[in-house]
């Protein structure tokens, strides 16, 4: 599906699939849980899912003649960390807009974790007080204009790389990679669980798994707390990506499976249940998830198993997208573990 698209390699190769045997047993042993470790995909600044997307965006950035990558996210954005890492790797400058997406007041929130790593890698980081929104942001457009005005050649990468024209391609590749691994494993996964916010990870998976009829087996766990906007953006990106890769069929709103039950209380703020899911996964599997994204999708998967959403004998693949560096910004919440 992706053969005709240029890809700039930023990852080690196919990410490993790990059986979560102790977590599965703890939850009753009727459902087999596995994790695809996107959090271990690269040596670039702790890796994560955004690198899969950026592999298909970097060739376009280089071809454009740009000298500065310009992107946006929250203060503890994993995406902006990855953009900073990629800029360093390919020899470009980086301008980052970090908006106040999360009403979180840990004393060191804007000085540790992802934002600290971006600064270490040389990004020009600007803090902006605007609140959360997954759409196109005026602060980002202003940053692009400022780079131009200073004589630079900006290349614009939206939040999460999601509404970029190539933003969905990387996770079409994820689906193709899973199919190859399934042949080696000798079975196919019945469900894929993924955290959904800006939408292109879910959308790319939806398109990729639509090739073998599993588009509605991709279970998005909303962490945006703005599910209507997120659902619409996933569908828009999926349709555009399907056209790009010649999927050959129309995708409908019903193809976007998005569970809205675990994003509370608000984007970026973990509930008691999210924190307990983070602890449970860490203590049973040594697998670290974060309070913003993966903790909520882990909470969702655990709860769905407990409620019997997955039938007995189902094999469920949890897409671990990364994000652990953000935990540093939540030190007080986990001060006792």
Curated annotation (Swiss-Prot):
Signal peptide: none annotated. GO terms for molecular function: 1-aminocyclopropane-1-carboxylate deaminase activity; D-cysteine desulfhydrase activity; pyridoxal phosphate binding. GO terms for biological process: 1-aminocyclopropane-1-carboxylate metabolic process; amine catabolic process. Keywords: Hydrolase, Pyridoxal phosphate. InterPro entries: ACCD_DCysDesulf, ACP_carboxylate_deaminase, ACP_carboxylate_deaminase_bac, TrpB-like_PALP, TrpB-like_PALP_sf. It comes from the Bacteria. Pfam families: PALP. The modification N6-(pyridoxal phosphate)lysine is found at residue 50. Homotrimer. Belongs to the ACC deaminase/D-cysteine desulfhydrase family. Catalyzes a cyclopropane ring-opening reaction, the irreversible conversion of 1-aminocyclopropane-1-carboxylate (ACC) to ammonia and alpha-ketobutyrate. Allows growth on ACC as a nitrogen source. This is 1-aminocyclopropane-1-carboxylate deaminase. The gene is acdS.
